């Protein structure tokens, strides 16, 4: 609503006594808002509290409406340019709060400066123009006049006290001399007693006078040292109860405040508690710890209480911390199967060693164990020896290949009967090659605007902290306990992912170089300990072989493709040259039994001929370097029937690796529960059996990836920020739901699939286990399988570990409850929409 016209003549002589009333109101307000005043004032604070209540409710009485709050001045009373905008030039936010345009408001402010209103009710408007404020010199005259008035009042008070004392003495004397029974006690006081009473009275009066002087002195000192943030300067303050309508809440420059030691005021503003205003409120509510006659001279009770509480807290910490450390150490020495990661890395094998044992040129590098996040089970004796240009630092010089995972499998030092006994293995996805849906916690803290979608962007964003962050992940996400559990689950092979930056980085690569190599070597030693054989699988190749996030960099395919396609081709061969020389050592011949070339090259986009030529060259290279393991190549997402005629003149000991999922195929994800099991046992069973044959198909074939997930609901599964086919949010242009009840209802939801496993019904668990066991049965018609993946942070249907521990995976992988050919069980009342 527009303001009324502001005219001096409208109020006639109302200003004639304004100055006198201002002096009284100003002094009264000083008393009522004194920071250290312990009196129970009930005048202006109640108005302020009511006003704050109206503000919270979005309403202020029209006559008191204000659009601005804090207005701050420095200690000298000058406007602080860092804290305040020009009140005559409000910022965009302030201007938008008005109901009319800026030019109209500017004109109205001009009229206000020319003819300011003198109404008491609108005194805030009188102060809008800078020219309307009292000058500093005028305020000095007011202070002088205030001082004279204050001294006069003190003299009058002292005179009144003297008259009261004299009257008291005369009354006591008359009562003592009177014989009237109403003025007499049983025994009249003696002269000595009267003298003592008089002396006591005089002593009490002196104490009161001294307290009054001390209080006045303290008040003068407080007025001189009044804080800028706590209260405005007197020089430019508004009249009592008034403030400027056009003032916005000031921006607090925190740096300046902290430099001046005023951080407590910052806390008051941020949290809305404490400070002079709240202290006054506490006094009014009877919560103030001071006393009425302590005049603010002593430490308030609430401050003493704070220090008492702090002391008690310190005492508790002194007792609790040593106990917690002891308990923590005991816990660290016991692997917790439910959460084997622990809270701190182990470095006990550095005890008693000197950092000087590391040559100066190696200190601070990846060869320096004092820089490692975790040294558990690493050999920390320094060596700069390499094989194929790759460091052996961390390895022990001896090894033992006598272990076996179970009685159905030969020990490592005996050949595995590939072709007659299926592989039953698991992947370590998302560990040494980061994948967002497996470890979403590494990506959750970034907004979609930041574009952190893969290991490339994550490493680039982390910058200098990338090495520490990712090494912590390497050290804690997969530990020795995981390999023990893999063995106990009846598994016998592990497919370990790594990427080229474990070996080398190029150009502007932001990846953390070489650290994951050390954890790859330790993982192989853990596999050795538990009798598990290893398939090596490079998930990230220079340039990216598919443009997906698990290749390291989502986007363009730069391997065998584009401007740097040939360069990255040669780089990928150089990586295999180094890696194959390293794993051709005798210590790995019994354990690294399958050597992968590249994970999921997207042959639907790449030249098939170029990929096959590279595959042949890479296979010959690694075999020339001494690799005797089977060499695995991926089907490139081509129809398996096409592979019947491809690479017929290939090198020996090669395996075809196929990855099978129902959830990424819109024709399969919408099948109901029973139909999915039938699809596996009919179509997939025969497909794998056929391609695995050297006479009717390609030859030895493994399924390197599959899962029991029957939806694509897992967070980040379809890329960071992408929706799902199941709920119809995957495509930006198509909202079709691909689920069994999409046409009939109810609509499918990811809530049940993504729920905590403790909420899974018995029927749902039965389906998930049957669905998994059907796939095991189908893939075992070939060379066997590797489940994707062993562990995830939250995607339960992708974690063999979670399913195994929660009863929807067979207790032993080699002893399933269901096989293709068995009758598909009844899944009870399991709804089809999840």
Curated annotation (Swiss-Prot):
Residues 1-33, 46-76, 98-173, 201-218, 228-245 have a biased composition (Basic and acidic residues). It catalyses: Successive hydrolysis of beta-D-glucose units from the non-reducing ends of (1->3)-beta-D-glucans, releasing alpha-glucose. Glucosidase involved in the degradation of cellulosic biomass. Active on lichenan. This is Probable glucan 1,3-beta-glucosidase D. It is a single-pass type II membrane protein. Residues 328-834 are extracellular. The gene is exgD. It comes from Neosartorya fischeri (strain ATCC 1020 / DSM 3700 / CBS 544.65 / FGSC A1164 / JCM 1740 / NRRL 181 / WB 181) (Aspergillus fischerianus). Gene3D superfamilies: Glycosidases. Its main location: membrane. Keywords: Carbohydrate metabolism, Cell membrane, Cell wall biogenesis/degradation, Glycoprotein, Glycosidase, Hydrolase, Membrane, Polysaccharide degradation, Signal-anchor, Transmembrane, Transmembrane helix. Residues 34-45 have a biased composition (Acidic residues). It is found in: Cell membrane. Residues 1-188, 200-251, 331-354 are annotated as: Disordered. The keyword Ribonucleoprotein does not apply. The chain crosses the membrane at residues 307-327. The keyword Cell membrane applies. GO terms for biological process: cell wall organization; glucan catabolic process. Residues 1-306 are cytoplasmic.
